[in-house]
Amino acid sequence: MQENLLEKQFLNHPLYAKIQELKALNLACNFSLGDSVNLSTNSQAKDEILAIAKELKPWRKGPFKIDDLFIDTEWQSFIKFNILKPFMNEISQKCVADIGCNNGYYMFKMLEFNPAKLIGFDPSIKYRLQFELINALAKTPIKYELLGVEDLPSYSLKFDVIFCLGVIYHRSDPIKMLKDLKAGLNKNGVVFLDTMYIEDEREIALVPNKTYSKIPNIYFVPSISALKNWCERAGFKEFEVLATKKTDENEQRKTEWIDSFSLENFLDPKDKNLTIEGYEAPKRVYIRIKI
């Protein structure tokens, strides 16, 4: 029912109609990938594209370049993608899901590695509309579902590779989320996951009081040992740390495309190693887990 309701709201959204009008123009478009997702249409319909893009703010993941229009997103998402890029050969000719896919930036980037099928899950109408705007021009075979991680066990397909980036700390039951990821895998499937974490040798997690880095829906920020235990409890047998990285103001920052605050406003102005609440400043661990 939730999917049907979201799908109905999405299809009735006025910007969806505008994107469909743009799509009907069937503009010739050169699609290329660098740090940004690049679309060249010889500036056809540029006024319409700019107007839709502005109405779809905030743009979190990217960047995107459409002719002379540069959508300078809050996150320089190529930084995260480049951390995972050495492992992207694992998606070649595989059935791949991106859970919490936002506007599809990572999926567009994954096309370079020739997945057999690429499906994004995110129950956000705005992010889906951003994806539809880009894909109206790019014309890729990527599929986008207005679904969440909890829908994976009952989904019609199982996946060889699942990406779940920046989701688990938003879940009040992280072990159930990991079990849902596991239930969405084919035999010998693999999950690539990243989360914020705390530096601690103990098997513990930070439970923020009300907000973490001014974000209200952060439930648990685990140590790496605690994260490993979560994965084992969910039934994963292999756990590999691929990288760790502190989030800095080069990777996440305020731009004209978000109309709100960003990382610089979320840290202690006197000590950038702390959040405004006094917790450790955000840093991320990237892992690969297998069943």
UniProtKB/Swiss-Prot annotation:
GO molecular function, one term: transferase activity, transferring alkyl or aryl (other than methyl) groups
Gene giving rise to this polypeptide: cmoB
EC number annotated for this UniProt entry: 2.5.1.-
Keyword Transmembrane helix set for record: no
Catalytic activity annotation: carboxy-S-adenosyl-L-methionine + 5-hydroxyuridine(34) in tRNA = 5-carboxymethoxyuridine(34) in tRNA + S-adenosyl-L-homocysteine + H(+)
CDD domains: AdoMet_MTases (cd02440)
Keywords from the UniProt entry: Transferase, tRNA processing
Coiled coil: none
Family annotation (NCBIfam families): PRK15068.1, tRNA 5-methoxyuridine(34)/uridine 5-oxyacetic acid(34) synthase CmoB
Role according to the record: Catalyzes carboxymethyl transfer from carboxy-S-adenosyl-L-methionine (Cx-SAM) to 5-hydroxyuridine (ho5U) to form 5-carboxymethoxyuridine (cmo5U) at position 34 in tRNAs.
Subunit structure: Homotetramer.
Protein name, UniProt field: tRNA U34 carboxymethyltransferase
Residues that coordinate or bind carboxy-S-adenosyl-L-methionine: K61, W75, K80, G100, D122, P123, S124, V149, E150, Y169, R284
Gene Ontology BP terms: tRNA wobble uridine modification
InterPro entries reported for this sequence: CmoB, Mo5U34_MeTrfas-like, SAM-dependent_MTases_sf
